[in-house]
């Protein structure tokens, strides 16, 4: 009788242990918004009831993208990845990140996490003081089309932050082959400066610092709105032409881009109002000179 009682107790403990650690889930479970952007339109973060893991969705992450959606699942607390998930998987909070754009570094710097950056593209063109101080240990993996994958692999990244210009990054295939997760950052496609800035919250999510990212964004938004509210001087608005020519061509941003909104909020006037698409357009030097 005593042996039977002990066996029953053991079985009960086993069932309890198994029940507490059964963390399997389905992708459809991740439908609860844990962060809904206020200014940005290119990403969202969802969770599931009783789960610490999150699902990051990035939409149309390059110019001209139409109905393109990419996913990153961040697995936390030993929780399993949904069996029906086919996107990128970050198996833990990111500690080693490779940034293919300097703006990615700025996002991490805004939450004091630029120490996570172990690799960059074009270190000589990066002004971040911490990166320059660590340039002997931060790897310069090169540029798209000429990536040093041997160096990239040696940096043991948890995640690579990519961007696309007019299509998917050429690094995708090789990163998949090397089993290195990646995520697109489409901040430059936002239509407002605060929308662009809000991507820092997503960068913070990668490090499990969502609250810190949201607090930082609120401070930035408050300061931005205060500056925007300053009365404009009683003078004509200065005309502004962004960028510089490249091979006798001037690329004019969309009048709906964050850059043009920034110029207007600062009291300037964009000289090229013909482009209301979602991409930059090429203008020859003669036309640019006449603007």
Where do the language-model regions lie?
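Internal alpha/beta domain cores that form substrate/cofactor-binding pockets in large enzymes
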Residues: 98, 116-155, 166-191, 216, ...
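Bacterial Sec-exported substrate-binding components of ABC uptake systems
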Residues: 20-105, 212-241
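A short, structured surface patch at a secondary-structure boundary
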Residues: 54-57, 62-153, 159-165
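Extracytoplasmic substrate-binding proteins
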Residues: 90, 137, 158-161, 168-249, ...
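Bacterial N-terminal signal peptides that target proteins for export
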Residues: 1-8
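Solvent-exposed, polar/charged alpha-helical surfaces in well-ordered, non-transmembrane soluble domains
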Residues: 95, 105-109, 150-154, 173, ...
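C-terminal motif of bacterial Sec signal peptides marking the signal peptidase cleavage site
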Residues: 15-19
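Flexible, glycine-rich surface segments
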Residues: 227-291
């Amino acid at each position: 009788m005593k042996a039977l009682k002990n066996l029953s107790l053991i079985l009960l403990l086993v069932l309890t242990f198994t029940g507490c650690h059964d963390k399997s889930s389905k992708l459809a479970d991740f439908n609860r918004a844990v962060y809904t952007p206020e200014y940005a339109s290119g990403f969202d973060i969802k969770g599931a009831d009783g789960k610490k893991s999150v699902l990051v969705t990035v939409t149309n992450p390059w110019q001209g993208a139409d109905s393109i959606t990419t996913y990153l699942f961040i697995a936390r607390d030993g929780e399993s990845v949904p069996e029906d998930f086919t996107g990128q998987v970050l198996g833990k909070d990111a500690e080693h990140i490779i940034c293919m754009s300097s703006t990615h570094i700025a996002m991490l710097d805004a939450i004091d996490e630029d120490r996570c950056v172990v690799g960059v593209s074009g270190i000589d063109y990066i002004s971040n003081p911490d990166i320059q101080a660590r340039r002997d240990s931060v790897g310069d993996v090169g540029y798209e089309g000429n990536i040093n994958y041997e160096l990239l692999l040696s940096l043991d990244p948890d995640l690579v932050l990519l961007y696309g210009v007019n299509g998917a990054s050429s690094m995708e295939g090789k990163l998949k082959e090397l089993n290195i997760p990646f995520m697109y950052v489409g901040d430059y496609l936002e239509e407002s400066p605060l929308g662009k800035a809000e991507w820092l919250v997503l960068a913070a999510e990668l490090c499990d610092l969502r609250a810190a990212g949201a607090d930082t964004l609120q401070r930035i938004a408050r300061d931005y709105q205060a500056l925007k509210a300053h009365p404009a001087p009683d003078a004509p608005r200065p005309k502004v032409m962004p960028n510089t020519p490249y091979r006798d061509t001037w690329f004019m941003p969309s009048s709906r881009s964050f850059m043009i909104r920034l110029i207007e909020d600062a009291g300037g006037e964009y000289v090229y109002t013909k482009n209301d698409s979602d991409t930059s357009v090429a203008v020859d030097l003669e036309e640019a000179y006449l603007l």
